[in-house]
């Protein structure tokens, strides 16, 4: 157990029996009231966001974690098969552990898997940006290129991304895996 004042953003704690990652932690001292810490956390099992006020003297259970690099190999039903970059051992990761960014997983991409002290998978972090090829989108006309609108495009992983009008089939684009938004066209 450690004091809440020693916890920072990105720490993983056991809150109400389940692992939560601290997304933001703000110390507040309102007027003549006692100080407290306002925490925004994400439940790593359910993916839900939780807000909680910790008193300044409260202690929390900090989970000891280990981060390892893995390479995505293929999908097996609802599981994703990953290979350890050091030992070449393969593990199955549930879709829930990866979250909505799983739609941007493509063969050979490196991910960071966070393991808890008991060996269970807490979280899977994809790279912030990935480069994917546009497989299907409506063709752009000369008039469309002058406007700043967007159109839907299906990328090689099967995800749908909203892209500018000038993007065509075969274009390689950079996408933010956290939000699923188009960032830029990659010139090769």
Curated annotation (Swiss-Prot):
Pathway annotation? Protein biosynthesis; polypeptide chain elongation
Q: Which HAMAP family match?
A: EF_P
A single MF term (Gene Ontology)? translation elongation factor activity
What are the GO cellular component annotations? Answer: cytoplasm
> What is the official name of this protein in its record?
Elongation factor P
Matches recorded under PANTHER family: ELONGATION FACTOR P, ELONGATION FACTOR P (EF-P) FAMILY PROTEIN
Compartmental location: Cytoplasm
Cite the CDD domains for this sequence. Answer: S1_EF-P_repeat_1, S1_EF-P_repeat_2
Mainly resides where? cytoplasm
User: What's in the keyword line of the UniProt record?
Assistant: Cytoplasm, Elongation factor, Protein biosynthesis
Q: Which region is the signal sequence?
A: none
Family label: Belongs to the elongation factor P family.
PROSITE patterns associated with the record = EFP
Q: Which GO terms describe its biological process?
A: peptide biosynthetic process
Report the superkingdom from the record: Bacteria
> Entry's InterPro entries?
Elong-fact-P_C, NA-bd_OB-fold, Rib_uL2_dom2, Transl_elong_fac_P/YeiP, Transl_elong_KOW-like, Transl_elong_P/YeiP_cen, Transl_elong_P/YeiP_CS, Transl_elongation_fac_P
Q: Briefly, what is this protein's role?
A: Involved in peptide bond synthesis. Stimulates efficient translation and peptide-bond synthesis on native or reconstituted 70S ribosomes in vitro. Probably functions indirectly by altering the affinity of the ribosome for aminoacyl-tRNA, thus increasing their reactivity as acceptors for peptidyl transferase.
């Amino acid at each position: 157990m450690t004091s809440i004042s020693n916890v920072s953003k990105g720490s993983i704690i056991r809150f109400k029996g389940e692992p939560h990652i601290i997304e933001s932690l703000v110390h507040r001292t309102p007027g003549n009231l006692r100080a407290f810490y306002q925490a925004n956390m994400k439940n790593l099992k359910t993916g839900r966001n939780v807000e909680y006020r910790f008193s300044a003297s409260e202690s929390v259970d900090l989970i000891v974690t280990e981060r390892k690099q893995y390479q995505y190999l293929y999908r097996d039903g609802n599981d994703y098969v990953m290979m350890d970059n050091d030992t070449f051992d393969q593990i199955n990761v549930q879709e829930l552990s990866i979250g909505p960014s799983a739609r941007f997983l493509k063969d050979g991409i490196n991910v960071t898997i966070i393991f808890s002290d008991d060996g269970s998978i807490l979280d899977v972090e994809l790279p912030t940006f990935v480069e994917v090829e546009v497989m299907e989108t409506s063709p752009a006309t000369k008039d469309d290129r002058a406007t700043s609108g967007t159109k839907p495009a299906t990328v090689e992983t099967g995800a749908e991304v909203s892209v500018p009008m000038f993007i065509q089939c075969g274009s390689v684009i950079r996408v933010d895996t956290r939000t699923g938004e188009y960032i830029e066209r990659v010139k090769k």
